[in-house]
């Protein structure tokens, strides 16, 4: 048994008097006891606010203003709250044992309206040990706490694993969550449902019989059965729509032939004119393009000739201007040549004298050298003579004294040894082991030179030191000279710059000396360079003309041979080109013949191809050849047969489903409609109606338990039934009758045992029945409705499949007919080659041939031009031949540039000498002054010491070497060592040496005399040469002065340049005159050609303008035609390719024939007739398209778009051909199936009424034993209104009488019911309601019932429950009973919407319970115990119930702070209910 959910506690945070209070809600009754103002109503207000957080409904008033509409502005909630965040939370444990905390956050909103901001939320899965205040309140200290904000509550909850926090933005979502978890009894979908729930809570709270509820008992107790009303409305709308659609189809069928005729003729009429205009426009465009091409080419030619004319005129003008300048230049060049020749003759004289001077100078220098050599020879002869004299004297002395000779030999031996020692010493000092006496003399010279340099440097430094103090002024003068030559320099760098200037002056003098040689070379190179430039100009001109560079003579010869070969090949190609042109013209004529033939074939092929493409699109097959067409045609036939069979099977299945749905929709779901009539005859009720409200889960069990008797009739008494049965004429073969109370049927008499998936029923001691649970139970309304839903879904699917199959079958039939027609008309042509493609190829070839012919003509002109160019090139090559030798010499330019640089240096040298010669000459004498800067004395002194030390070391080396050199003769005395041992031979050797020495002395004396005489002769010759040189030099100076007066450069180059310039100017003057004559001839011929071309251009332009004006005008109309056609999607209908091959006359004939047919077809339609009349204007082709659009628009309006879903009338008619047969049959069957009978309507309404009466009887059973004061029982009385009962009888039994209302198409079923209600109740005023509105009300069964509350009070018996006839306590008790009945009704009504394992909470309120006596309160306790309901009541202090939980509330005021003191008491007489296993486990866990 599923336990009912219970409210566990109510938590109030920050309410008036309640900062953080949790009230445990008792399982039965929770009593709030206290005096006035203790807070009882505030506590209930918090509970109700958490239950229904809708500020538009909440209105807490005391009992004194219960009936007042003018309550306080804040509706009793604003004043019950404290500032800041407030909470009201309901702790609930539902049937699934889930703990839920449904809470609302409240906060006062400042303002006059005293509104309260309410935000609902829920916390799910909070652990049992956590109190609601633990998450809503935060402890600040041991004595202080604060209220958390809602986001802080969310964060606080997040610390518990598995706990979910969810806030709600709408009350609907909050109540949906409450309903889902079983907190409220009914699903509150909208504000109306919330209002009903609040009115129920309010009526419970304030007690008594609520007029708001009693007046609307039908809305509270009777569920809305919208399915019946909706089913009737759907059937009505379907019937109405079917009838309208059927009428539209019939109308379309009647007009279809007219539409086809209208579309065909209008298409032929407009398309023929459309294509005729398109063809004409195409031809005109081709003509205009041809004229425009000719016009543009003529213009370009004229512009080119005009440009040529202007260019020739400009060049002629420039030529005339340059010719006069050339004449002047030529005369000047001739005069200049004469002057250069005079200067050259003068220069020749100077050169002859200079050659004499050079010769004299050379002789003078040679003679000076001869004199110097003679002097040297005289000196050498004198030295040799002196040495010989000394040797003779020495030998004579040695012979005179032998001992002296011996001493001399000893001395020489000693000298030899000293010489050897000197050699070793020199090797050590020089660190040279290879040193010898012979190399010592050369090394001495080197070191002596180095010594001289260092000595000179040392002396210079010494001189600088000596002069540094005394030569300051001299240094400044020398520095000024340096500044005048080299500019501003540093003092330290002055000496270096001075030396550099002196060196530069010397270099400049050398450069000036080479002037004549360089100028001669410059003249030769300039001549060669000019010749090379002239050749390069010719080469450049040749390259510009022929794009070939003549680099050398090999290339030159190759070009000459190439041009000769090209001339030969061009002559041959020119002949071949003529033959090729003839062949191309022949092919062009053949292609034109093929094009004409293809144009004749194309229309038939296009029609066949369109039909083939349509077949391919419809069938989805490739259809590559005729065999595939025949094969696909056979497949289509087979598919059509299969689809027809499938359609028939689906129609059969649909009929089965509809019959089953009709059976299940009948009262009781019986498969025999006679049972309902038998039940009425026997005065019973069908068993299926009694069990109509069982759940889906219980349906298999009860269906198996009753077995075949599930369609039995239940009667209150079996006596007399047999007699009635005998009198029956028509009844089922097996009829089961069961005796039992219809209002309280009990199945305890059936001995049934539930097995696994089955039921075993013992009929008697010897019989038993075993019935399995049906797979698809149909016992009970819920099971039948579930089955009906499945069957209806299947029926919809079957209907959809049947419609699709019928459509596909019709489509296949149409496709087979299309295949038949294609085979009969087009199959012979359709698979031939595409003539349009062949046409395109042929036209492309023809155009290609035309272009080829044009290219051949252009090629011929090009070849002639190339021949002319080759001839010109050969002429140019002949001119260039003599000059090719120098063109390949790349060094000329470099050498010329080098000489140019040298000549430039010459000019610089002359300029330098002219500017600084005197300064350099002065600087040479003062150069030593600059070596010692008086400002650098210390540096000079240190430099002097360093140089001195180096010089001393060098002197030591020189001394050693000089000693060695001085003693080198002693190495010849090596034999003296030997002579010392051979003294006898010494005398003889000395005598021999003396003789030899005397001969040498005589020879040297003779040579000295000769040399002296020769030197005197040389001196005389030198004096005469000096005298001749001085005379010649003076003459040359006079000649140079005369040459300078000429003012020209007198050299061979200047003469050649002058001659060359004169010749060039003469040649240019001759060329200019030739070109002038040529330009004048070109001007004349060009002007004549331009005149002829201008005449032709004017003619072509006139023709083009006229044709273009026509084309532009036609284009404007054609654009409007195209725009209209494209915007209205008719271009593909009008642009028929096959019409493009017809002539204009044929197209006009077709259009005229269709025009006649259209005049007859639209004679009765004013709009189309007017549009057709306007379209006959040939000057306005767009009007024909407008007529075609009007026809289409007319057809679109006539075709039902709700049946045929397409915008194209042609496609719509084609689709309608397929749909018409299927829809006609389908609509007829549907109309028969949807036909509504008045009897079935009455039966459905009666069945629904009876079901609700049975449900209310069951509700009354729960209230049968309730007593309050004198009231011993409470019940709900339900009965059918008399006027509506008369209506039901008229629907069920008087069908023939009211046939005029239900079998006419004038009224819908709702309107027919309204008319019948007026007919059977003429005394009732219907007011302003329309028949449709009244009929819809009559389809709602609740309008047939009247509900009232009756109480069994004392001796009065059952009477109407009214507050005036009952005491206060009795009224409160009666009201609570009624409310409990409503809650039960809501639970039953919502059972299907809620989960099966959820039983909702039941809780009601009662404020001011002191109005009930103790017995009444005890009755309430008993009612709560019996119906498992919780009750929250408020009572004064003098009421202390024995059961439940009682809270004593006392409001205390301490200074400015109010606090409600609460004491909770458990009822001392309360009996503990046995705890469930789950509760016991929970308590164990908590412990």
Curated annotation (Swiss-Prot):
One of its GO terms (biological process) is DNA replication. The keyword Coiled coil applies. GO terms for molecular function: ATP binding; DNA binding. ATP binds at residues 34-41. It holds the Pfam family MukB. It comes from the Bacteria. Residues 297-426, 460-666, 781-806, 836-1111, 1210-1266 form a coiled coil. Its main location: cytoplasm. It is found in: Cytoplasm, Nucleoid. Plays a central role in chromosome condensation, segregation and cell cycle progression. Functions as a homodimer, which is essential for chromosome partition. Involved in negative DNA supercoiling in vivo, and by this means organize and compact chromosomes. May achieve or facilitate chromosome segregation by condensation DNA from both sides of a centrally located replisome during cell division. PANTHER family: CHROMOSOME PARTITION PROTEIN MUKB, DUF4476 DOMAIN-CONTAINING PROTEIN. Homodimerization via its hinge domain. Binds to DNA via its C-terminal region. Interacts, and probably forms a ternary complex, with MukE and MukF via its C-terminal region. The complex formation is stimulated by calcium or magnesium. Interacts with tubulin-related protein FtsZ. This is Chromosome partition protein MukB. It comes from Vibrio vulnificus (strain CMCP6). The gene is mukB.
